Structure formats: C-alpha cells, structure tokens
C-alpha cells in the first residue's frame, strides 16, 4: 500500500484497495479523529472563491485550504473511496482522506443552492463534469476549455456569503447560510408559508393552464 499526500488530500493505493469488497483499515490513514462532540465551521465565499474561515479572512487561498484541513482532519472527516475511469476505459479504485476538499466543496454546493436558479445549478454541474473529464484526460489546452471556464466563472458571480457546517467525528452536516444573494428570501412570500404576489384564483388558473398545455 502506498500513499500520495498533497494540498488537496492524500490518496491511498494498493493493498485492500485492489479488492472491490474491502475497505481500508484505520492504520491506512495518516490523520485520525482526535476530537469528540461537535463544532460549527463557517466558510465564507466571494464569487465562489473561499475567502474566510470562521470569519478569519485569508488573502492566500492555499492558507485558507490548510486552515480548513487542520480543523476538519481533527474530526477524521474526508475519508472515502473513489472509483474512476482511465482514458482507455479501465476502472481504477483509490482510497483517500481529504477533509478540506470535502468541507469546502460541500459548503460551496450548499451555498449555490441558495444563490443560483434551478437551471444555473443544473447546467453548471453538467459543464463542470465535462470540464473535469477533459482535464483528467489531458485536454487542458483544448480551446473549448476556455469557453467552459468563462461559463463557470459567470455562474459564480452571485455565489457570495457564508455557509455554516456542523462538524462531528468522521462526518459533517449542513446548517444554513448567510448571504445577501439568498434567493430563498424573496418579495413574493415564504415557501410553504405565505405568498404576496398572487391570489388563490391566480394559482387555480396557473394550474389549469399548465396541466392542459
């Protein structure tokens, strides 16, 4: 079994990984859970980029990532197994521990749910998957990558605010967000509670038209 450690986590290959039915023993991991109970983690984003951790601002994104890793790794967060495809179609399996990526990506996607429309989320995810596949298959210099990057950058213009997570040993959960771009707050009303933009008769007409179109 061998391991590769970097800024974005540690990959673990060989040994039990070669058996699709086997998991990894505790000894395979470099970082272990040393905390009990729970605590909240606040990650603040500006245009989709991580800018603050627990309200501490970072000009250097690398230091911000390292701070999240330090906090999350103490709970043993970020352990999982990845199965991927090579360019020639052979599948590979690798274990990993990556507290910072799991927490940052989880917080970012949670914030996107509040600040992007349904179709912005859908197409951003579709394009992001293609971008990841092209990048994995050494197509970074393909001109379409610049087009995809422009779309992804545009999609993040309103992804601003703080996502709040609750950390527990070996896992985390989402709590809420604080954002001036929160689309849950709107002038028409509150979902499941009340509305201010139309009457009951308007709703009946809308249902009738859409159900017969």
Report each predicted region and the residues it spans.
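Nucleotide-activated chemistry modules centered on ATP-dependent adenylation/adenylyltransferase
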Residues: 3-213
């Amino acid at each position: 079994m061998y391991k590769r450690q970097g800024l974005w986590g540690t990959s673990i290959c060989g040994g039990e990984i070669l058996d699709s039915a086997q998991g990894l023993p505790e000894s395979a991991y470099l970082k272990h859970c040393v905390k009990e109970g729970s605590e909240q983690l606040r990650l603040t984003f500006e245009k989709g980029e991580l800018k603050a951790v627990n309200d501490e601002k970072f000009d250097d994104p690398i230091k911000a990532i390292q701070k999240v890793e330090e906090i999350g790794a103490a709970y043993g967060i970020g352990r999982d197994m990845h199965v991927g495809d090579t360019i020639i179609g052979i599948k590979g399996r690798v274990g990993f521990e990556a507290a910072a990526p799991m927490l940052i990506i989880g917080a970012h996607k949670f914030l996107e749910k509040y600040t992007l429309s349904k179709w912005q989320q859908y197409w951003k995810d579709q394009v992001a998957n293609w971008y990841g596949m092209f990048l994995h298959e050494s197509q970074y210099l393909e001109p379409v990558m610049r087009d995809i990057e422009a779309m992804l950058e545009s999609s993040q213009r309103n992804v601003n605010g703080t996502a709040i997570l609750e950390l527990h040993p070996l896992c985390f959960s989402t709590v809420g967000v604080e954002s001036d771009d929160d689309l849950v707050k709107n002038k028409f009303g509150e979902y499941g509670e009340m509305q201010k933009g139309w009457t009951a008769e308007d709703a009946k007409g809308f249902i009738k038209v859409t159900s017969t179109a």
